[in-house]
Amino acid sequence: MKTRNIFVLMAEAFLFTMTACSNSTIDIDNTPDINAMPNPLPAKGEARLFTTTADGVKTLSETTAEVKSGTNMAPTTLQIDPSKQYQSIDGFGFAITYSTCYNLLKMTPEARKDFLTRTYSPQNGYGASYARISIGCNDFSSTEYSLCDEQGLEHFALQKDETEYVIPILKEILEINPDLKIIAAPWTCPKWMKVSDINTHEPYDSWTDGHLNPDYYDTYAQYFVKFVQAMKEQGINIYAVSPQNEPLNKGNCASLYMPWQEEAEFVKALAAQFKKNSLTTQIYVYDHNYDYSNIADQDDYPIKIYNALGDNFEGSELVVGAAYHDYGGSNTELDDINAQAPDKSLIFSETSIGTWNNGRDLSERLMSDMSNVVLGTVNRQCKAVLVWNLMLDKNMGPNLDGGCQTCYGAVDIDPNGYSRLSYNSHYYVITHMSSVVKPGAVRIGTKRVPDNKNLTHSEFINPDGTYATVIMNTGDSDVSLTVDDGTNHFSCDVPANGVVSCRWNK
């Protein structure tokens, strides 16, 4: 059954393995090269290309092109310039929520392994390399909770969502990709740390809204330390944290209002505790929308934190940058923040598709998400891009009352048997980047570009010396061009309303 906007995998398609893939049965038209695991590493003299079109005719379709040496006389040329270097790349990935893990664990072990290998393996898959998790609950948890609901840090403990769902899945992913980076953020502090007003310190007994009691800044920082240490004991390294998910959001099923004035003070305590406990976990401030919820005195939230803290505080080197979401405002805000703090990093840490943006319609979403979520952020200095849930069921769950009831996963699974998968735009845009742009890559410039306003692109040099480019074409006509690295070149066709990711050896 062919569809325009998503492709569907039946359970049988996942029963193949890398050594016995010929036993699989699948409708090839609906899937991305399902009879063999993707192989992003090009041979010498070869370019490897992945192509997706908004009409769904091509979905991560894998081809190769001959890399030729000598003079390139092609009139339509994209020539890279490795001498122009911008930010390094940490990776691309998805949020691993309780709901994602619940659905993954409903799959057969064989099907789950094949799906995770296809998604995360650097050698035999698309090489997704970053994950986002919550510290305590989020709006796709089994219930509202913190890791220390009873007052006193002696009661700190990982809970069922972590021990039975998130940690087992993370361990499976880490077996496939040991270099996976993980960023973690709380949706709320424990309720006993909350007050309704930081001046009166009036207790605030609610999962939603409230402020962190200033008397508990140091205690809450120790809570973060305990979390990082507890995950380390499970063999899981927390690469980075943000102090608060969506600090200007007073809603959701769990939240904590933390304007920049309060986050700055907490970050100072957090960095000091990390330093005291010999943790190298990085800290990304803010973690919310481009428009700062239209609160006037919260504009340029990260810059105000940097200016308030300065550089002379314990653990200052751990405060590396800021994280952004796109539920309000424009990604041009990244240009402004980078101009004011060029020594600080930027990452894009959350976006979702759902009923509000026709999230299951590839013809509606592919070009927009490719432009705004990945290329529009990476070309504005973001060194990582993460989208929200990797997997939800087709009923948009499991989820919590008060949280998002209208979100889709990057992948949707049919809860009737947990064997039928539907892939949405967020899966494609992340894997179009991760398949060719590897952790540690550096974004580079161009010397010559085609005179075509419908093309948007980004170029990289990987740690292994291979080059990569990702090109999107929003026009209604195919574009044939030559990609040139100054020594070698190859031909590349970018289909109308399509994306091509290329990686090649010098």
Question: Model-found features: residue ranges?
Answer:
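Bacterial N-terminal signal peptides
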Residues: M10-T19
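N-terminal catalytic cores of secreted or lumenal carbohydrate-active enzymes
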Residues: L60-I238, A264, K268
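Bacterial N-terminal signal peptides that target proteins for export
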Residues: M1-M10
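Bacterial Sec-dependent N-terminal signal peptides
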Residues: M18-A43
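Short, compositionally biased low-complexity segments
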Residues: N23-I28, D81-G93, F140-S146, N395-A410
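Substrate-binding and catalytic surfaces of secreted/luminal carbohydrate-active proteins
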Residues: M37-T76, I182-A184, A221-Y239, P247, ...
